[in-house]
Amino acid sequence: MQIEKTAELNLLWGTLILEELSRLGVQHICMAPGSRSTPLTLAAAKQSKLKQHLHFDERGLGFMALGLAKASQAPVAVVTTSGTAVANLYPAVIEAWLTHVPLIVLSGDRPPELIDCGANQAIIQPAIFAQYAKQINLSTPDLAIRPEALLTLLDEAISNQSQPLHINCMYREPLYPSTMSANFTQYLSTLGNWQHTNHAYNQYGKPNLSSLPSSDAMARFVHGKGVIIAGTLTPDCDPQALVALSQKLGWPLLTDAQSQLRQHPGVIGNIDQLLHQPKAKALLMQAERVLVIGGRLLSKRLIDYLAQNKWKSYWQVLPRQMRLDPSHSAKQIWHASVTNITSLSWPRSSEANWALQLTQQNDEMERLFEQQIDNAEFGEAMVVRAIAKSQTKQQQLFIGNSLPVRLYDMFAPITTEQGATFTNRGASGIDGLLASACGVAMHQGRATTLIIGDISQLHDLNSLAIASHCSSPLVIVILNNDGGNIFNLLPVPDEKLRSDYYRLAHGFEFGYGAAMFGIPYNRVEELESFEESYQDAIHYEGASVIEVIVPQQQASDQIARIASWIKQS
């Protein structure tokens, strides 16, 4: 092939790739600038079916794509140039793999003759993500390779894919076509009708992998005292159906922070703190059967409860085959959606309403939180509860890792409304949280609140640049307790060790950071000013930062006081 046609063929392959991705359900493409990915960048610039998102930092870019994929429940493409640019996506790819989010990484790469020979910005990119992504390594574009071979390779890899895919795209120079004089009509003629439709070249049916219990199995299972536990569930999976199932069986529904039901009045949302209480735990230990729907529970006390109880029958329901049982206690695992499992003809339990007292205890716990948190000193738990109380079904809440998500799990209020709730609890890292929340906010433009700790925000400071481009309300609430104060809750043997090696007090505040990116900022130290700032921010068409300044020990001391009261009650 003539050398001057190389750039045009590179662009053609990039165009074919992105066109097929759009036909396979990709709605968003996230791109970082770089030269070796130029064929993909130029193709994206001409592609009207994909919404473009650009950012200079590949680590934040990957997490933004993760948030977009979580919110859209569809695959999202990420384009980077060669070298360490690809490696910067690794944290987001790991999180996506562990939580079954379909990211598609398209990495520009040097051709084979420039690998492992000292060429600039050239590393060995195939399989860079190891077991955390399915791998496709494309050769350099070549007219000897029929275009349908490229399309069918993509179709097989992406159709029904629920985890990351890495497509490594090798390109020879020149990368920038000076003209578009090449005629590829003959080359594309083998595609037939594909050029005149909007369908993928190969269309795969949905695999039916569901496994459901028989009527006899369900009748045996519900014979006795049981509980239902709702783990991590996505907002679109009809979690309300679990409330109806709980009522039908007459078993209590214990809900995780990530279940979309933590604040529902018809469930036992305060389960983490109830397991502190001797009489509540004694009642719960009477349960003989458990139905766990979803995995990745947040509460260690709830995980320990599952491990410690002597279950006669332990069923787990997951959307696909995977291991999400760290106590290794489940005996029967069903592969089904929430809709499929709840729409079965379940019989009423022989021990229906055996634990009605739990509802009373759950309500008593809420009254305790109102007294000990809402009417006490200003602090992190008070802010988390205030945010949760104000949420509507049209809003979204992204809860950061470390202390914020635990405060929500422990103390979230009982409310009549709850918006969609998002977390990054696969690897549970504190990186990329702001970028992920930006992605969630950008998909449909719903008002979104992020609750994030100060160390997490320092990790992702660059992503304020992404936030500055948000056109819908994005409220970034930074709980600044001057360091990693979750370590106050852990048994570090010496206070100086805790301070010097774990907590790492920094003394930073975020006003200048917000100003650098042109984002409105408020600093608050009491509830009235927080609520006023929050209401302004949730109605502002763009990102806002509210920094909550609290003493280092405030949250941990309050948690300890409440735990002591509960244990004695």
UniProtKB/Swiss-Prot annotation:
Instruction: Tell me the domain of life.
Output: Bacteria
For this protein, the record's CDD domains field holds:
TPP_PYR_MenD (cd07037), TPP_SHCHC_synthase (cd02009)
The UniProt entry, under SUPFAM superfamilies, shows: Thiamin diphosphate-binding fold (THDP-binding)
Q: Name one GO biological process term.
A: menaquinone biosynthetic process
- Pfam families associated with the record: TPP_enzyme_C, TPP_enzyme_M_2, TPP_enzyme_N
Under the heading InterPro entries, the entry gives: MenaQ_synth_MenD, MenD_middle, THDP-binding, Thiamin_PyroP_enz_TPP-bd_dom, TPP_enzyme_TPP-bd
Q: Which UniProt keywords apply?
A: Magnesium, Manganese, Menaquinone biosynthesis, Metal-binding, Thiamine pyrophosphate, Transferase
Class of the enzyme per the UniProt entry, highest EC level: transferase
Kindly state which reaction or reactions the protein catalyses.
isochorismate + 2-oxoglutarate + H(+) = 5-enolpyruvoyl-6-hydroxy-2-succinyl-cyclohex-3-ene-1-carboxylate + CO2
| The protein's required cofactors | Mg(2+); Mn(2+); thiamine diphosphate
Entry note: cofactor: Binds 1 thiamine pyrophosphate per subunit.
Complex formation: Homodimer.
Q: Which family does it belong to?
A: Belongs to the TPP enzyme family. MenD subfamily.
Task: Describe the task this protein carries out.
Answer: Catalyzes the thiamine diphosphate-dependent decarboxylation of 2-oxoglutarate and the subsequent addition of the resulting succinic semialdehyde-thiamine pyrophosphate anion to isochorismate to yield 2-succinyl-5-enolpyruvyl-6-hydroxy-3-cyclohexene-1-carboxylate (SEPHCHC).
Q: What is this protein called?
A: 2-succinyl-5-enolpyruvyl-6-hydroxy-3-cyclohexene-1-carboxylate synthase
Report the source organism: Shewanella woodyi (strain ATCC 51908 / MS32)
Name the gene that codes for it.
menD
